[in-house]
Amino acid sequence: MARKLLLEKAHIEGIRYYDVYRREGGYRSVEKALKTMTPEAIVEEVKKSGLRGRGGAGFPTGMKWSFLAKPEGVPRYVVCNADESEPGTFKDRYLMEFIPHLLIEGMILASFALGCKTSYIYIRGEYWWVKEILEQAITEAKNAGWLGKNILGSGFDCELYVQPGAGAYICGEETALLESLEGKRGNPRIKPPFPAVKGLWGCPTVVNNVETIAAVVPIVNDGGDEYAKIGVGKSTGTKLMSACGNLNKPGV
């Protein structure tokens, strides 16, 4: 049987809720990162892992993170692309619906690694019930001290928000997504400049897919080298697949 990473605990009753998620080892990676690692060390682990974008392009995630511009006095942002609009695709919805705290944990790690105090999950408008699940999970995480000011006494501040789209397919493209997130019509921007230099509100921004962000959690927990041992060739780690149609057992 193939090894599971992201869905390893999906079968546990109540894993959607903070108390159960925490009991099963949730947020352990954030503790490790804030207490024993530097932001640069996290980026290096992601590079060593060989993790590639899980949204379709397959660009090396660590390399993408290293491209983020860091001008003095200018805020930076992490945006999670949860605008899952391809027909028959629902793996990201599955993660958010059943293990929302895994995505939140990954967003905290990415935000710390990239020096971002405010981050966003841009979700497909049709996923209205998933938005409610995420917002409840964010409230739970904040009440437990994983979001907000001075997390774990580290001096790191992080706020996380969920923003629904309006159902436009084009907003799955990262620059159209950013336009929509800014409250504008979701038209793609001309590139360059790329979001890493001029993204959300003209500031340096990293846009990653739900599955990509979630994969950062096992990478920080176990190390990039361990993650890189899984997979084939340059395709390291695990990959979620949406199985649907005329099947006996559709699912992820």
Mark where each language-model region is.
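Conserved short loop/turn motifs at secondary-structure junctions
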Residues: 33, 118-131, 135, 166-167
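Iron-sulfur (Fe-S) cluster-binding modules
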Residues: 1-48, 116-121
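Hydrophobic alpha-helical positions that pack around
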Residues: 131-252
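Gly-rich Lys/Arg/Thr-decorated short loops/hinges at beta-loop-alpha junctions or inter-strand turns
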Residues: 21-27, 80-92, 195-200, 241-248
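Histidine-anchored nucleotide/phosphate-binding helix
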Residues: 99-113
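A structural-propensity feature for long, helix-poor, extended segments
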Residues: 79-99, 114-117, 122, 131-132
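Short, hydrophobic/aliphatic alpha-helical segments
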Residues: 10-11, 34-51, 154-164, 240-247
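Conserved phosphate/anionic-ligand binding catalytic regions in large, soluble enzymes, centered on
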Residues: 47-68, 167-179, 183-185
